[in-house]
Amino acid sequence: MLVADFIRRVPLFEDLDDRSVTAIANAVVEQSYAPGQEIVREGDTGVGAFIIRSGRCEVLQRRGADPSRIGELGPGDFFGEMALLDEFPRSATVRALEPTTCLGLTRWHFRGILESHPQIALGLLPILTRRLRNSERQVTEALHH
């Protein structure tokens, strides 16, 4: 499947016009990861986001001394999107569970795309809001346990 066709199926980008999808497809870089390899590490400064093209990954977050598994991601899922907007440290580690291929999009490429395709930002808002609410819920639960 062509990169543009794959991107068109990602929920964040599914409503974009062909020109916007082509701009994103031209900006992403395909990268492969072996099982057990960290794609991003909690605490590191991120420079971009990733879309999983194939494979599966686990999401780990430190809770005390040991990391806890907080989720699993597969084809079409994306992570690291906060790094598209700011330069704060990564909030979680994402590690490949099996051979995994990701499409990487850097902050500077994303910002250039946003200038000519601002509707992408509107697609990102509900996703960021949902993740913020989940984080808030996790903090509240941790405080009450």
Question: What are these language model-derived features?
Answer:
Residues V21, A65-D66, T100, L128:
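Short, flexible segments with low predicted structural confidence
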Residues A4, R8-A65:
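Regulatory nucleotide-sensing modules
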Residues T140-H145:
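Signal-transducing coiled-coil/dimerization helices and immediately adjacent hinge/linker segments
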Residues F6-R9, R69-P126, R133:
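Cyclic-nucleotide recognition modules
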Residues M1:
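Conserved polymerase palm-domain catalytic core
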Residues D17, G36, G55-C57, G76, ...:
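Short hydrophobic/aromatic patches on the structural cores and recognition surfaces of FHA
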